[in-house]
């Protein structure tokens, strides 16, 4: 069974009402995980994330592991929302990415 088929099966089993509420819960847990990682591993912003993963980056900590888990949970829920709403977000994502790139270009001109 592919990931897309699993998403459809899970969506069909639980329905929009239950899964939309679960999505809200998972997003709240992600918010908390981001905050804990920022606070405990990045010393409230005093430590910057490296541009690329390397041996100095604290990837082997419970806050990092929890953050990765919560990102996965939210991604799964968002795929279910796409399934429920019969939508393809890719064109919207592309449009928004392009808009942000334009903003960055405009910032560098000033």
Q: PLM features: residue spans?
A:
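Flexible "arm" and connector segments at domain edges
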Residues: 1-71, 75-110
